[in-house]
């Protein structure tokens, strides 16, 4: 086959000459007219075209191999040809159609190119593989040890026996390394003096990072969970305060909180007032429903802590570069008083105190008298120390689900009137703590706020909400009257019509709707919620504490007495409802509906 084309030759790339391609398979021959070719290899088997037979014939150029491949501006494939007998400076780019008789060279180049790509991919994989990194470290360590160890030069039977024993011991140690790590996680820390509390999310579902601990720790990767459940060395070295608590409370304080029970126990059949036999008469009877509550309750369910290894203990400064919501999986206990808290986490920050709801005695950060007392204690401590303000948030994807009705019903079966009085008194003291607190209270609502969890928000000074949060006060559905001074504050901030719609019909408000009605100050995007909150909190904490406190006093001076009176009225009504058979029946019906929904 003969093909004519105009290209830059291998001898003069700036001069255009006619190249003629012909010859047997796997050969590419170039002939330059009227120019003598440099010395090079020739092939006597090459035939010359008839029109060139009379002229002086330069030696034919033979393809040695294909060096590279590219696409030209027109999208056509070109190959970089290495000519036999010439160096790399004389390589030329040839179109694919010029190499029709050189298919074997092209196939060989494509094969080598594919193998190089596979090798490069394998190399990158090996470089990024942690197992490979460990193997390389192990190899380098062993090689260095063999080079530097003087004992490697000793030869003898005694030495061999010693080396074999040492090798067997080392192999045994390596085999037992992994089980020792897992067994170390189950060790009992009660005797070690190390006091830790690792709060976990009370919500089972795992969601995206949308605020303060929006991910459930139970569903995190084991590696990630192990990294987050660490304790700073300052915590491990602190003085034990186990004497302050009883044995049960000590175990509960140190324990983790697996969510092995549903929000309400499964009870076959409908729940009616008839099931609570004796409740309507003297409040001391029992029922199958209450037996199920007692058997399946989660109040006293605690387990030992999973354990902490020394290698995982890092200073808190090492975590400054991590997102704030990740660092909330553990609490830094800097004072002995912080160890008293089981259902909340308290962090003393620079200029403010951070209180996080992380209930172990209830589900979904619900409020019972124990949780309320701990929040009150933390607020009292913050009021007396140098904190300029308080940040209130929650661990998990739920901010607060209101009152813990399972806790209430379990205790109302003993003495309904006495227990209803105690519970109403607990709510009254809890709400009064917010009313009388002199320093600013900032709330970061990362998820749903229901019942009392929503009604206390107007008692705080600033409320920032995650866009995924929502607000609802379905008191009529609960079978109870409003609480948390919502009968006064809701009409003031959103008007009578909207307040009645929330308090009577239980309308659910989105974060944007709550912001529009004045219940929420600002709404932030879930992905940057914690960052936005912390930036603003630090700005407030940099202000003069006297100015902050006096400014709040001026805003609340005309409302304090009115709120205390409203709180007193609401608690009296709650005590009356909870002490009646109708109120108990309504609460049981609500729990039955929750069971059916679950």
Swiss-Prot record:
Residue positions where N6-methyllysine is found in the record: 135
Coiled-coil segments: none
InterPro entries: Chromo-like_dom_sf, Chromo/chromo_shadow_dom, Chromo_domain, Chromodomain_CS, ClpP/crotonase-like_dom_sf, ECH/Chromodomain_protein, Enoyl-CoA_hydra/iso, Enoyl-CoA_hydra_C
Annotated region described as Interaction with EZH2, given as residue ranges: 61-309
Annotated segments matching region Acetyl-CoA-binding domain: 362-594
Effect of residue 521 to A: Abolishes CoA-binding and ability to inhibit histone crotonylation
GO molecular function, one term: transcription corepressor activity
Quaternary structure and partners: Forms multimers and multimerization is required for stable binding to chromatin. Interacts with HDAC1 and HDAC2 via its C-terminal acetyl-CoA-binding domain. Interacts with EZH2, EED, SUZ12, REST, EHMT1 and EHMT2. Part of a complex containing at least CDYL, REST, WIZ, SETB1, EHMT1 and EHMT2. Part of a complex containing at least CDYL, MIER1, MIER2, HDAC1 and HDAC2. Interacts with CHAF1A and CHAF1B; bridging the CAF-1 complex to the MCM2-7 (MCM) complex. Interacts with MCM3 and MCM5; bridging the CAF-1 complex to the MCM2-7 (MCM) complex. Recruited to Xist RNA-coated X chromosome.
Name under which the protein is recorded: Chromodomain Y-like protein
């Amino acid at each position: 086959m003969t093909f004519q084309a105009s290209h830059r030759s291998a001898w003069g790339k700036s001069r255009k000459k006619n190249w003629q391609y012909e010859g047997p398979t796997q050969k590419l021959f170039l002939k330059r007219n009227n120019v003598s070719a440099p010395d090079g290899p020739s092939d006597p088997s090459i035939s010359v075209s008839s029109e060139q037979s009379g002229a002086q014939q330069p030696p034919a150029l033979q393809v040695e191999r294909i060096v590279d491949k590219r696409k030209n501006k027109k999208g056509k494939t070109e190959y970089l040809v290495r000519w036999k007998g010439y160096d790399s400076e004389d390589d030329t780019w040839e179109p694919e159609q010029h190499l029709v008789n050189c298919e074997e060279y092209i196939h060989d180049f494509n094969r080598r190119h594919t193998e190089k790509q596979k090798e490069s991919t394998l190399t990158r994989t090996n470089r990024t593989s942690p197992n490979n990194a460990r193997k390389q470290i192990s190899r380098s360590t062993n090689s260095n040890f063999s080079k530097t160890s003087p004992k490697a030069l000793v030869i003898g039977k005694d030495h061999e026996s010693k080396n074999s024993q040492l090798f067997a011991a080392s192999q045994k140690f390596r085999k037992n390394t992994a089980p020792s790590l897992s067994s170390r996680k189950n060790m009992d820390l009660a005797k070690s003096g190390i006091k830790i509390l690792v709060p976990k999310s009370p919500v089972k579902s795992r969601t995206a990072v949308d605020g303060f601990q929006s991910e459930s720790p139970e569903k995190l990767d084991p590696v990630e969970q192990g990294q987050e459940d660490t304790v700073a060395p300052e915590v491990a070295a602190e003085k034990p305060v186990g004497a302050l608590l009883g044995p049960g409370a000590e175990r509960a304080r140190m324990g983790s909180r697996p969510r092995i029970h549903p929000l309400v126990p499964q009870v076959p059949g409908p729940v009616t007032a008839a099931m609570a036999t004796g409740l309507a008469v003297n409040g001391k009877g029992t029922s199958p429903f209450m037996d199920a509550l007692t058997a399946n309750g989660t109040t006293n369910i605690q387990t030992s802590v999973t354990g902490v290894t020394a290698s995982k203990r890092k200073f808190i400064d090492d975590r400054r570069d991590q997102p704030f919501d990740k660092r909330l999986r553990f609490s830094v206990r800097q004072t002995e008083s912080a160890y008293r808290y089981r259902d909340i986490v308290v962090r003393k920050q620079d200029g403010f105190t951070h209180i996080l709801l992380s209930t172990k005695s209830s589900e979904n950060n619900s409020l019972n008298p124990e949780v309320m007392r701990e929040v009150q204690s933390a607020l009292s401590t913050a009021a007396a120390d140098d904190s300029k303000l308080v940040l209130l948030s929650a661990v998990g994807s739920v901010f607060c689900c209101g009152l813990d009705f399972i806790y209430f019903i379990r205790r109302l079966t003993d003495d309904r009137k006495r227990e209803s009085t105690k519970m109403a008194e607990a709510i009254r003291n809890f709400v009064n703590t917010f009313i009388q607190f002199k320093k600013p209270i900032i709330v970061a609502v990362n998820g749903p706020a229901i019942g009392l969890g929503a009604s206390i928000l107007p008692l705080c000074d600033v409320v920032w909400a995650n866009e995924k949060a929502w607000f609802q006060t379905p008191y009529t559905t609960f079978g109870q009257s409003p609480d948390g001074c919502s009968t006064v504050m809701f009409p003031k901030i959103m008007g009578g019509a909207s307040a009645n719609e929330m308090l009577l019909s239980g309308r659910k408000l989105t974060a944007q709707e709550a912001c529009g009605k004045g219940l929420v100050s600002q709404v932030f995007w879930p992905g940057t919620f914690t960052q936005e909150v912390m930036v603003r909190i630090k700005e407030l904490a940099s202000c003069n504490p006297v100015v902050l406190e006096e400014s709040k006093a001026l805003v609340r001076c005309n409302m304090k007495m009115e709120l205390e009176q409203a709180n007193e009225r609401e608690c009296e009504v709650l005590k009356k409802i909870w002490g009646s058979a109708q109120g108990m029946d309504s609460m049981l019906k609500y729990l039955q509906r929750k069971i059916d929904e679950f």
